[in-house]
Amino acid sequence: MIPFFKKKIYLTRAIEDNLNFQKYFNLLQPNLEAKEIFVSVPLLNICFDNIENLFIPENNLIFTSRHGIKAFSESRYLNLKKIFCVGKSTAEIAIQFGFKNVCFPDEGNVKSLIKLISKEKKNLQTFHYLRGEKVSFNLRKALSDLGYKTNETVIYKQESNN
């Protein structure tokens, strides 16, 4: 227990995130035991859709989360696509899963991603946004408003743990 805390702290992210948080906490605070301080209680499960037969003709793919990367990682066409990731950590996961042509903005947010994409030649580029069912920003609309043809496919769902 943290000396000034009398109760445990609940971590509500996905199990993988909670375990990583506890691992990094132990690195920063080696004298404290994360398992004694934190309780992992995920509120959501990530459920990947079956995309085995999904064919995406576009050469430019957009990912705004590591879950999208993981869901699409079984694709046979990884080396043939240019991958736009929302930030460095998503890009690193893409590279770990075998994507070769990966780019990401300096700042890991959707507005910076849009700026990066907007450097591409508009009239020659078509994009495909692979995403979760629930998103906080309509990236397809934002890119369409800038003149980009953007298709999207939901490849995972965030389901409640009720």
Feature locations, PLM:
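Signature of uroporphyrinogen-III synthase
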Residues: 1-162
